[in-house]
């Protein structure tokens, strides 16, 4: 399958290579850099002020930015490129980039047109514009023309975008489809079905075939029924449990903004074609209730985790679509609190937009979090969140009063709450003291075989991911955060990425790891989440002496002030940094050669400079490291009690076990 995907990307980058490299228009005007809720509703949404109308306003705000590139009805949705690694490149991929811009901004437009068919932005009637652009796809004389898939054609990015287009045709059928002539409908059906009926990839991509086929089957066209049913069976076979699908091979947000969005929407819209599959999609959706919402922090904000993170708040759409469920015990007020908070997390961040368009990054532009399959218009996949507007105004998702779910009363201070999911080996940990959530997840991909360079990267290879501390990229000088780095035979600092899950018992999350370039360098890893951080109990074995490093999370700068180092009078061995909003502490319970406070530049997603605590040690053959990695919210200093949750550490003479006695007299043993 990887060879197939590689071929697709090469085709994307080469597509349109005979064209003159397209010029990108400049915006007609600048929109507000952040979104302001026009009419906050604190009665139903006391925490965010965002109700259903507020969601409509936010969608219009984002779509208005895209429409500043549209001066007349012929102008494509084609936006300024960011980062050389993305496409289009040198005359290539322009047609596909325009198609992405068209189909993905339509995820904003279609729900809005469903509400208001006469919507006008930048002096352009939105419905007229998208219908015109839809017909341009069928016109051989148009620069946006998409050829029907040839007899021997394979899956491509066009299939992805046509799958999205099929959903939008369903969403705003009265505006986008019904006004077309029969001849136009037939041409569109022929082109889209040439892809939908055709070959696919055994991942979330199969949904694109399903939606194209389903829409045109509903409209009475002859379709490849075998292809649709085959895709549905294979999609359901990727379900692992507890709300998670495996997207061949990773667990990430694709389980949510793809599988747990497409499945329920298909079930509600076209499930009558195969009722048994529809029922299974809905059952799988219900499973996420007890796990996925716990990934968001106390304020309902999302974690920076996995690939395609520029899709950002698209991650909340499955929480909204729980409105399709009939279970009265679902806390819809909490679901909307999360969805609205995550939406505002970005649209109210002044770094989100550049030239009126969302950046390729987490908040602002951040190349390490961007993949080579993206173009600038790819960011509008975030607009999937607005499919929440498919739910009518009287749906409980919209009418329930916002609340913080378990963060209000169930979660207690000075406690830690683990949600281990045995079907996937994912561990979600909630920390009431700091109000944050942490994820430990899958990564086992070599750089050598990771030709797209993302499944082996920082997007997946960290020891953990925390909502309060977005991940720092690895530095050229061996700076590393929330991971170990080992100096390999080439003298390079190589981070861990080949993890094998072992167990989760007695609050201890166990993994083994080996170094890609030397499988004889082995780590036995144990994470013990605590109320104010994590206790690491790790063993490393090396065939020849070498150096290792361990980095904590990082702190961004705040208010233009640098991250500062602090000292504790009561616990002088603690190394502490603070940015005024949070503090981090590293307390070494076994010896390291060196602990440094560093200020890396250009590798943090929030600010140019950040603060990092990093340990370093020379390993002769085998050693055990026991390390407290702590955090605290606010500007108050760590107390002695917070810095000393461990009373004693006893390492067996053979280094095969470590016994930890905590300050509260509980005892845990890690066996290697």
Where are these regions (language model features)?
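Aromatic-lined, polymer-binding surfaces characteristic
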Residues: 98-99, 106-116, 123-323
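Catalytic and substrate-binding regions of extracellular carbohydrate-active enzymes
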Residues: 373-392, 396-558, 562
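Short alpha-helical segments and helix-capping/turn motifs at coil-helix boundaries
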Residues: 88-93, 147-152, 613
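Carbohydrate-active enzyme catalytic cores, enriched for enzymes
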Residues: 137, 141-148, 298-304, 311-449
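Bacterial Sec-dependent N-terminal signal peptides
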Residues: 1-28
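Short linear interaction motifs
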Residues: 80-90, 363-366, 406-411, 519
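Extended repeat-based interaction scaffolds and adjacent low-complexity, acidic/S/T/P-biased segments
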Residues: 464, 478-672
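Low-complexity, Ser/Thr/Pro/Gly-enriched N-terminal "stalk/linker" regions
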Residues: 24-100, 128-133
């Amino acid at each position: 399958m990887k060879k197939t995907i590689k071929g697709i990307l090469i085709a994307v980058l080469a597509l349109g290579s005979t064209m003159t490299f397209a010029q990108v228009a400049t915006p007609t005007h600048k929109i507000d850099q952040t979104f302001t809720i026009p009419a906050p509703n604190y009665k139903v949404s006391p925490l965010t002020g965002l109700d259903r109308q507020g969601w409509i306003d936010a969608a219009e705000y984002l779509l208005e930015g895209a429409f500043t590139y549209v001066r007349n009805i012929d102008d494509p949705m084609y936006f300024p490129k960011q980062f050389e690694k993305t496409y289009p490149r040198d005359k290539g991929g322009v047609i596909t980039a325009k198609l992405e811009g068209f189909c993905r901004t339509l995820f904003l437009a279609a729900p809005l047109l469903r509400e208001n068919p006469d919507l006008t932005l930048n002096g352009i009637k939105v419905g007229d514009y998208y219908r015109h652009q839809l017909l341009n796809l069928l016109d051989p004389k148009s620069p946006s023309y998409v050829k029907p898939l040839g007899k021997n054609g394979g899956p491509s990015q066009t299939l992805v975008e046509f799958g999205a287009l099929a959903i939008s045709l369903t969403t705003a059928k009265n505006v986008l489809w019904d006004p077309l002539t029969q001849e136009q409908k037939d041409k569109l059906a022929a082109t889209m079905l040439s892809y939908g009926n055709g070959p696919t990839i055994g991942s979330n991509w199969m949904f694109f075939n399903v939606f194209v086929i389903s829409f045109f089957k509903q409209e009475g066209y002859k379709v490849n029924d075998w292809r649709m049913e085959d895709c549905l069976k294979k999609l359901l076979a990727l379900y692992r449990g507890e709300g998670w699908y495996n997207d061949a091979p990773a667990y990430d947000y694709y389980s949510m903004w793809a599988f747990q969005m497409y499945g329920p929407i298909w079930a509600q819209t076209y499930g009558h074609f195969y009722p048994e599959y529809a029922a299974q999609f809905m059952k799988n959706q219900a499973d996420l209730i007890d796990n996925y919402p716990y990934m968001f922090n106390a304020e309902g904000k999302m974690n920076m985790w996995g690939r395609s993170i520029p899709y950002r708040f698209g991650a909340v759409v499955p929480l909204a679509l729980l409105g399709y469920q009939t279970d009265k015990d679902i806390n819809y007020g909490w679901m909307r609190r999360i969805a609205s908070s995550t939406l505002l997390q970005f649209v109210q961040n002044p770094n989100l937009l550049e030239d009126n368009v969302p950046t390729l990054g987490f908040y602002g532009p951040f190349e390490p979090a961007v993949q080579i399959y993206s173009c600038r218009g790819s960011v509008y996949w975030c607009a999937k969140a607005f499919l929440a507007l498919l739910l009518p105004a009287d749906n409980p998702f919209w009418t329930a009063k916002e609340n913080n779910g378990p963060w209000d009363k169930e979660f207690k201070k000075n406690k830690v709450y683990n949600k281990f999911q045995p079907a996937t080996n994912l561990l979600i940990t909630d920390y009431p003291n700091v109000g944050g959530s942490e994820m430990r997840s899958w990564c086992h991909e070599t750089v050598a075989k990771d030709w797209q360079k993302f499944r082996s990267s920082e997007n997946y290879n960290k020891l953990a991911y925390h909502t309060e501390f977005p991940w720092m990229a690895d530095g050229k000088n061996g700076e590393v955060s929330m991971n170990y780095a080992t100096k390999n035979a080439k003298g390079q600092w190589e981070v861990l990425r080949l993890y094998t899950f072992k167990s989760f018992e007695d609050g201890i999350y166990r993994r083994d790891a080996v170094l890609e370039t030397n499988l004889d360098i082995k780590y036995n890893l144990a994470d013990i989440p605590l109320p104010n951080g994590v206790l690491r109990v790790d063993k490393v074995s090396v065939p020849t002496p070498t150096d290792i490093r361990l980095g904590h999370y990082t702190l961004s700068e705040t208010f233009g002030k640098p991250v500062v180092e602090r000292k504790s009078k009561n616990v002088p061995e603690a190394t502490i940094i603070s940015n005024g909003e949070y503090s981090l502490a590293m307390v070494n319970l076994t010896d390291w050669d060196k602990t440094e406070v560093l200020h890396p530049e250009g590798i943090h997603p929030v600010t140019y400079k950040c603060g990092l605590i990093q340990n370093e040690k020379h390993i002769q053959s085998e050693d055990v490291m026991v390390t407290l990695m702590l955090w605290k919210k606010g500007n108050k200093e760590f107390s002695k009690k917070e810095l000393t949750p461990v009373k004693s550490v006893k390492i067996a003479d053979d280094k095969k076990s470590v016994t930890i006695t905590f300050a509260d007299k509980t005892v845990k043993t890690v066996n290697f």
